[in-house]
């Protein structure tokens, strides 16, 4: 099973994918592209390591990084990708990809990340 799509930096709700993660599933995610969290230079999916955390949705990733939620989980850093990754056993649901920024400040963001997700059963 696979999913391919765009994650817009100005979409605060994130991009829901067609991938449903079940405990034990093995996924690989690859991300590329350029996006900006305001009138600044653009960054890749790893985000801007120099920007301070001023209330980001994911405190474990840099501002402008690609992160995800699985079902009702907390945010999980993705950055440029994850290879053959397995989530904790209590995580289950649809994968939503999100640009890491401060809630309520997405309106001045621009750009996007192209993302591919592959899923294998463990």
UniProtKB/Swiss-Prot annotation:
InterPro entries: Galactose-bd-like_sf, PA-IL
Keyword terms of this UniProt record: Cytoplasm, Lectin, Periplasm
UniProt KW Cytoplasm keyword: yes
Any coiled-coil regions, as ranges: none
GO molecular-function term, one example from the UniProt record: carbohydrate binding
Primary location class: cytoplasm
Gene Ontology biological process terms, A to Z: heterophilic cell-cell adhesion via plasma membrane cell adhesion molecules
Compartments (UniProt record): Cytoplasm; Periplasm; Cell surface
SUPFAM superfamilies: Galactose-binding domain-like
UniProt xrefs under Pfam families: PA-IL
Lineage top rank: taxon: Bacteria
Summary of the function given for this chain in its UniProt record: D-galactose specific lectin. Binds in decreasing order of affinity: melibiose, methyl-alpha-D-galactoside, D-galactose, methyl-beta-D-galactoside, N-acetyl-D-galactosamine. Similar to plant lectins in its selective (carbohydrate-specific) hemagglutinating activity.
Family: Belongs to the LecA/PllA lectin family.
Protein name (database record): PA-I galactophilic lectin
Originating organism: Pseudomonas aeruginosa (strain ATCC 15692 / DSM 22644 / CIP 104116 / JCM 14847 / LMG 12228 / 1C / PRS 101 / PAO1)
């Amino acid at each position: 099973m696979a999913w391919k799509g765009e994650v817009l930096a100005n979409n605060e709700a994130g991009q829901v994918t067609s991938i449903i993660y079940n405990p034990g599933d093995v996924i690989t995610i690859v991300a590329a592209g350029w996006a900006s969290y305001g009138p600044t230079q653009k960054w890749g999916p790893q985000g801007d390591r120099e920007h301070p955390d001023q209330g980001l949705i994911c405190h474990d990733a840099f501002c402008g990084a690609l992160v995800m939620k699985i079902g009702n989980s907390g945010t999980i850093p993705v950055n440029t990708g994850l290879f053959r990754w397995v989530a904790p056993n209590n995580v289950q649901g649809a994968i939503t990809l999100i640009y890491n920024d401060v809630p309520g400040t997405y309106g001045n963001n621009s750009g996007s990340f192209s993302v591919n997700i592959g899923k294998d059963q463990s």
